[in-house]
Design a protein with these regions (language model features):
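Acidic, low-complexity, intrinsically disordered peripheral segments
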Residues: 3-7, 26-36, 248, 432-484
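Gram-negative bacterial Sec-dependent N-terminal signal peptides
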Residues: 2-25
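Periplasmic alpha-helical coiled-coil/stalk elements that build and connect Gram-negative outer-membrane
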Residues: 3, 154, 158-276, 377-380, ...
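Bacterial Sec-pathway N-terminal export signals of envelope proteins
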Residues: 25-97, 248, 255-290, 339, ...
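Heptad-repeat amphipathic alpha-helical coiled-coil interaction surface used
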Residues: 77, 82-84, 89-91, 142-144, ...
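Small/polar-residue-enriched beta-strand and adjacent coil segments characteristic
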Residues: 58-60, 96-158, 268-276, 280, ...
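Hydrophobic stripe of amphipathic alpha-helices that form coiled-coil interfaces
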Residues: 85, 92, 99, 152, ...
Length: 484
């Protein structure tokens, strides 16, 4: 069989062109697109994946946050969505490489020229298609994919911040409910002592039946308050387990953290806080990336009606039964010029432009919401700081008043009504001091979250133990912007 040298040369050129693409075709991530999404990590395990938590010991606040970041389905969902968009970047990058296809066939050919007999034909071949130039369509699609990945990564970081705050809220809700239960038990004990004193005075004739009934009513109310507080503890335990990605029946022990006693108060320029928040809030970064993706979508839609230049290379070997095999090969350039698509391209461009306008409006909406979030959180923290001091003063005054009323009643110079009023005021003051103290923790965390800066350092302000090198939630690095 003679050799067609030009055909052999073309086949060699085909294999040479394909050889760089064949090796990474088997790789799991040839463009390192998925590598741009870091593994799920907790508060103090930035470089390493999440590790199983030790739930047998009492948990610090940082432990609760760490488990929540690693186990809450919301964080896993955000991580998976980021990987989806990272893979789409790889899909867009693949458009810059040639495509290779192979075919094989076995057929019977019937022809009158051969007396109607059947001949068996075998054929194998390979084809290469490579888009050389497309007026920026692939580049626009790649930019769109990269910006959508940036949006997904920023959305993941926003989710991390939200779960972080939810874990802080659940932690202090549980702490507050336990403290409220203890306060209700103290009030119940005081009400029982008052009831016993009223009963004793009634037996000796120095108290009226109304005094005894009032004391019984106050004690029954104290018992009811204690039962309600016990239910609040159960509800807080379930909420804490839920945010940690656990079953509500899972017992969780916490390291006690007393109510906050902040100093002079939080001082800060709210205007600068808003500016800082707009520079680092992940949801605003996501909105900006989605707008840029929409702008890239306009470029892609406009490039769809422009010509494309492609290279095509093919090689095949065919053989009829009983005959020698013969080779064939092709190489050529193809220019595809869209002439008319029924105005579909026109409306695709208009749709892309409208989408960009919508994303611009959404970006502005998020920008304004960021300012409002910071303003509300700032005001809430100022209020919480002042409430802690006022609640402490109220508790001190109510404690002295109750002690004086109890002493007067036991001495026989005070009325049961004065004592019960003082005890009710003390019970209310205890609850308000507890609530104000734990509300301050949540308000401080909420301000940090509103600025996109909720991190391990925030927990240090609460006196919580934070793992070393606990990082803030930061967007994963974007993939390289160089086209293949």
């Amino acid at each position: 069989m003679t050799t067609d040298f030009p055909a052999a040369l073309r086949r060699g050129a085909l294999l040479a062109a394909l050889s760089p693409a064949l090796a990474p075709a088997q790789a799991a991530d040839p463009f390192n697109a998925l590598a741009a999404v870091p593994p799920m990590a907790g508060l103090g395990t930035a470089p390493a994946p999440c590790q199983p938590a030790d739930l047998a010991r009492p948990l610090e606040l940082s432990d609760v946050v760490d488990v929540a970041l690693c186990s809450n389905p919301q964080t896993r969902l955000g991580w998976a969505n980021a990987r989806v968009q990272a893979a789409q970047v790889g899909v867009a990058q693949a458009a810059f490489l040639p495509t290779l296809g192979a075919s094989a066939s076995l057929s019977e050919v019937h022809s009158e020229a051969t007396g109607g007999g059947a001949r068996t034909q075998r054929r194998i071949g390979a084809d290469l298609a490579y888009v050389l130039y497309d007026f920026g369509a692939r580049a626009a699609s790649l930019e769109n994919a990269r910006q959508l990945f940036a949006a997904a990564a920023a959305t993941r970081d926003a989710t991390v911040q939200n779960v972080f705050l939810a874990a802080v809220q659940a932690f202090f809700q549980r702490q507050g409910s336990v403290a409220a239960l203890e306060a209700s038990r103290q009030s119940e004990k005081a009400a029982l002592e008052s009831l016993n004193a009223a009963e004793a005075r009634y037996r000796v004739g120095s108290a009226t039946p109304a005094d005894r009934l009032q004391a019984r009513t106050a004690h029954a109310q104290a018992v009811l308050n204690r039962i309600t507080a016990e239910g609040g503890v159960k509800a807080a335990e379930g909420a804490l387990a839920n945010v940690m990605g656990l079953e509500p029946t899972r017992p969780i022990a916490l390291v006690p953290l007393p109510p906050a006693s902040p100093g002079a108060g939080f001082e800060g320029d709210v205007t600068k806080l808003i500016e800082t928040a707009r520079a680092q809030r992940p949801d605003l970064a996501a909105a900006e990336a989605q707008y840029r993706a929409a702008r890239a979508g306009i470029d892609a839609a406009q490039a769809a009606h422009l010509p494309t230049l492609s290279l095509g290379v093919g090689a095949a070997r065919s053989q009829f039964a009983g005959q020698s095999a013969f080779d064939s090969s092709t190489i050529g350039l193809t220019v595809n010029i869209p002439l008319f698509s029924g105005y579909a391209t026109t409306y695709k461009v208009r749709a892309a432009e409208a989408q960009a306008e919508a994303q611009a409006a959404r970006r502005e909406q998020v920008r304004l919401q960021v300012g409002l979030d910071v303003w509300n959180a700032y005001a809430a923290l100022l209020t919480a700081t002042q409430s802690v001091k006022s609640a402490a003063d109220l508790l001190e005054s109510a404690t002295l008043s109750e002690a004086m009323a109890a002493g007067r009643y036991k001495a026989g110079v005070g009325s049961i009504l004065d004592l019960l009023t003082a005890q009710t005021a003390l019970a209310t003051a205890r609850q308000q001091r507890i609530q104000a103290g734990y509300n301050w923790y949540v308000a401080r965390a909420a301000l940090a979250q509103s600025m996109g800066a909720l991190e391990g350092a925030t927990l240090s302000e609460f006196g919580a133990v934070v793992p070393p090198h606990a990082p803030a939630a930061s967007p994963p690095p974007a993939p390289s912007r160089t086209t293949p």
